[in-house]
């Protein structure tokens, strides 16, 4: 029988719960995710220095790392439907602003890094906004109000820029 797996921002069933394999999957996911971001940053530097080919290779490798991370995340049962993903994202953002960044800020202050503590708190405030945004979007999905509203709105096509004024988008 599968056990319930609880990671920050996701609660799903997984056959790996409580095993070293689960820890390995979490480490692999984190490592590939970090590598992707790192290579994206490196690409930006290479491009600014005029090394277009090196920048392109960093970006290509970053895309490879993204796919590796996705593979491990799927094994950890981390991808659901849009409503589940919004709920998981909101939970993760909540943890970040209520616990993680505040704890980091307190530690930074205690260790004599007040400027870093202020940055942690600033990012925590941004994470709070992210949680609110995800919860609002989740409400819209659950209320079936993504493409229709009870009052008149301005809708803009994200592809061609067409403007529609009304209670529903032209999709």
Predicted regions and their residues:
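Non-heme di-metal
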Residues: 2-171
């Amino acid at each position: 029988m599968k056990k319930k797996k609880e990671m920050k921002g996701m609660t799903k069933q997984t056959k790996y719960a409580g095993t070293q394999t689960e820890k390995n999957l979490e480490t692999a996911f984190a490592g590939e995710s970090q590598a992707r971001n790192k290579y994206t940053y490196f690409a930006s530097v290479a491009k600014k220095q005029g090394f277009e080919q090196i920048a392109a290779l960093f970006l290509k490798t970053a895309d490879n790392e993204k796919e590796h991370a996705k593979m491990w995340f799927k094994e950890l049962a981390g991808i659901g439907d849009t409503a589940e993903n919004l709920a998981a994202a909101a939970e993760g953002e909540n943890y970040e602003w209520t616990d993680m960044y505040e704890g980091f800020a307190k530690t930074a202050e205690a260790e004599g890094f007040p400027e870093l503590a202020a940055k942690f708190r600033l990012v925590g405030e941004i994470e709070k906004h992210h949680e609110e945004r995800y919860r609002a979007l989740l409400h819209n999905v659950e209320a079936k109000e993504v493409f229709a509203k009870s009052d008149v709105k301005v809708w803009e096509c994200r592809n061609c820029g067409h403007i529609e004024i009304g209670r529903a988008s032209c999709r």
